[in-house]
Amino acid sequence: MRFYQFYRIHCFIIFFSCSIHFSCKKGKEPISGFTVHQRKQNAFFQDASKSPLTKKQLKSFKALPFFKLDSSFMVKAYLEKQKDENFKDIPTSTERIAKQRVYGLAKMKIKGETITLNIYQTESAFLNKLDNTLFLPFLDLTNGENTYAGGRYLDLIIPDNDSLIIDFNKAYNPYCAYNPKYSCPIVPRTNFIPVKVEAGVMYLKEN
């Protein structure tokens, strides 16, 4: 009886191990990534029905290049909410004009530097009461070296109070960095971070 119970537990462990690696099918490799977030990012880019990559890029795509995880780039910010609810025209990488407003000012310290960044809310998110997302586009000293020259983005969630956790390890490149058919909001110069934010997705020459 004990042997039977042990056998069942052993089988369950094998099944569970396969599940967290997405697939144990012969010839199918696990999705790359050190964190759940990174694995989700890679899975998204590999999915031909959703990926921003071109068909040619998809053929050779294996995984996104990430900086090493760095807890110092997970920062706590004070969010000063703005009263202005007027949405302004934001230029994009195409002729499209995006509608966004400054939801609040996020004040934080990164590598000893005191920084204030504009946190945006899109008009579509504002109109959809179920959409609690915010948008943080930013520039830093890595742009044009090992990150996209036009800056990177972060998606945030509206906090319950005036405290906001910003994890730059989740920073990603605009989709237009990979495919010009995408229309990406231009990162404002006011959101420049005067340090090297070596966290999140990189952008290498082969991209």
Residue ranges and their predicted role:
Residues 1-32:
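Bacterial Sec-dependent N-terminal signal peptides
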Residues 26-86:
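Start-of-domain marker
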Residues 31, 172-207:
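Extended, aromatic/histidine-rich regions of cofactor-dependent oxidoreductases associated
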Residues 79, 119-123, 140-142, 168-172, ...:
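A mature extracytoplasmic/lumenal domain signature
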Residues 135-172:
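Acidic, glycine-rich flexible loop segments
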